[in-house]
Amino acid sequence: MSVGVPVNPSSSSQLPAAPTTTTRRRVADSQEDHSHVNTVGGGNAVVYVPDEEETATSCCGGGGGGGSLSCCPSGSHHNYLVGFLSLRKFRLVWMLMVENKSKWTAGIARNMRSTTNLGRFILTLLSILVVTFFLIVALSGGVGRRRKHVEKHEFVVSIHPRPTIEKIIREDESSNSFQVLVPKTTSIPEIWNQPEVGNYQKCVARPKNQRPIKQTNGYLLVHANGGLNQMRTGICDMVAIAKIMNATLVLPFLDHSSFWSDPSSFKDIFDWKHFIKVLAEDVNIVEYLPQEFASIKPLEKNPVSWSKSSYYRNSISKLLKKHKVIVFNHTDSRLANNSPPPSIQRLRCRANYEALRYSEDIENLSNVLSSRLRENNEPYLALHLRYEKDMLAFTGCNHSLSNEESIDLEKMRFSIPHWKEKVINGTERRLEGNCPMTPREAAVFLKAMGFPSTTNIYIVAGKIYGQNSMTAFHEEFPNVFFHNTLATEEELSTIKPYQNRLAALDYNLALESDIFAYTYDGNMAKAVQGHRRFEGFRKTINPDRQRFVRLIDRLDAGLISWEDFSSKVKKMHQHRIGAPYLRQPGKAGMSPKLEENFYANPLPGCVCDTSEEQTGLNRFERPSLRAQSLR
């Protein structure tokens, strides 16, 4: 298996090839074409713009002539002659400038009365003449060298006439014509533009008056539950809770019994030494429970979900002081989104975005693969295509699947006791916008949004469910990659058997992508989009699934044209690209579960308006409502 080959069984398309060569040269059509220098063929390319006189007199009247002594040579000879005459003209200007400066210097020298000053001026004059001599020699040899470079394609001299000539010149395609390197992509489509971020920047600095860590009230053991991203955000909450209770946090235990059955430890996935070091001024973190407490039976406790800080400061802290060791068997969503004080909110972000760094082998491979996706300076899209068996079974979504596949999902749903919903109408759920997009729907969505078919797409997901589910996607976008097609077997050898380590790799590639899009609001989508907001509101597309599925159903029924469909899709998503907006607390009586997740949008809390009118605590607690206009 070769590295970096798109996983399209019906296509041999690979990452975009290097720029191709052609013998066609375009003459500018407008003054705008000459407002800047266009380079081709890399950093060594040169563009030269001649005067109108040079363009008009480059041929001697009538025909082009066919002999070797023709007044209007063809192909590359024409360009060499113009280049030589232009450089000669430039050299004559230099000589006139030197002559004028010499006369000026000599006149001053004659007026000098002091022999000492006269000697200094003579020395200066000689220095100027020596430098000028070397410049003339260097310019005299330039044409020959340029011709050699052109023959080697090291750089190209392109002759662009003035905009009064409005035609396309085709170079003689004989063996003597020179080749101009033309980049494959001449402009970046508008779809790759990033959102407007205003004056918002990350702000997670510790308070200047932060008190030093007190003597610990006890030790907190935590068993993080769920998939990687659910465990990740849960661990960040545990750091904040340990701070609230003045507890010493023991390195968390990871879930080994969930659907993924991954035996990886915290040290296998995260850089644990970095984690402890970054948070050293905030919370005491130890690798193991001290020996003197190992024999103590810990108090097991499942904290109440979405609890306020006061719950831990008052109720749980008392239990910690009494028992000295407490175990939390669940860590997901145990701290409220909006009520913790600003210092605790910033601590949650320091833990998530600064302290929790993946292990060295995962980080290194992530860098290699992201560079591989960006070969030839092409951007790439990371698509979280959550069309996996566990998600489809849990949600009851079976649109476009066969009857056998639907039965298979239903069996899985009934076999897992803690999944409460068993009988689900998948059709109704899809129309409500509560199903992940199918691969075909995702492809149509991306095409309607304006992504070209040559887009490099990295699929952030495990195994896509359903026979031939990706066929329609590959037909629209052939340059599709998964971790196992982008990396070699050797590169994946240390992480491939472990689902959480693969999820960490996907997380980094999604975080670093030029655009991230997700087809379902799962834990990874929340974690990645929040991290991208923190890192400068990198473009993140959040499809409006409810409106989109109704629109694509109309398209499939022939009730709407493709042009109208694409226009409507773009319009409905123009404000769903990851621009800043304030996370709003839930209304009275609303379940905290329905609020926007803190880690999906850390504004306010960890992102601040740095404009002049926003200062002091106001920057942290009351971010400018200007962000609402950017939503």
UniProtKB/Swiss-Prot annotation:
Residues binding substrate: 384-386
Any GO CC annotation of this UniProt entry: Golgi membrane
Sites where a glycan is attached: 246, 329, 364, 398, 425
Annotated Basic and acidic residues bias: 26-36
Keyword check for Membrane: yes
Entry comment describing in which tissues the protein is expressed: Ubiquitous. Strong expression in young seedlings, particularly at the junction between hypocotyl and root, in emerging cotyledons, and in parts of the roots. Also detected in the inflorescence (sepals, petals, mature pollen and siliques) and rosette leaves.
Membrane topology: Single-pass type II membrane protein
The keyword 4Fe-4S belongs to this UniProt entry's keyword annotation: no
Lumenal-side positions: 142-631
Superkingdom assignment: Eukaryota
Pathway it works in: Glycan metabolism
EC number(s) given by UniProt: 2.4.1.-
Listed transmembrane segments: 121-141
Residue numbers on the Cytoplasmic membrane side: 1-120
Disordered as annotated region, ranges: 1-36
Compositionally biased intervals (Low complexity): 1-13
Alphabetized UniProt keyword annotations: Carbohydrate metabolism, Cell adhesion, Cell wall biogenesis/degradation, Fucose metabolism, Glycoprotein, Glycosyltransferase, Golgi apparatus, Membrane, Signal-anchor, Transferase, Transmembrane, Transmembrane helix
Disruption phenotype: Cell dissociation, spontaneous breakage and ectopic organ fusion. Affected embryo development. Increased arabinosyl and decreased galactosyl residues content in the cell wall.
GO biological process: cell adhesion; cell wall organization; fucose metabolic process; regulation of plant-type cell wall organization or biogenesis
Locations listed in the record: Golgi apparatus membrane
Enzyme class: transferase
Pfam families for this protein: O-FucT (PF10250)
Alphabetized GO MF terms: glycosyltransferase activity
Family the entry assigns: Belongs to the glycosyltransferase GT106 family.
Record's function text: Glycosyltransferase required for normal cell adhesion and cell wall integrity.
Name this protein carries in UniProt: Protein FRIABLE 1
Lineage: Eukaryota, Viridiplantae, Streptophyta, Embryophyta, Tracheophyta
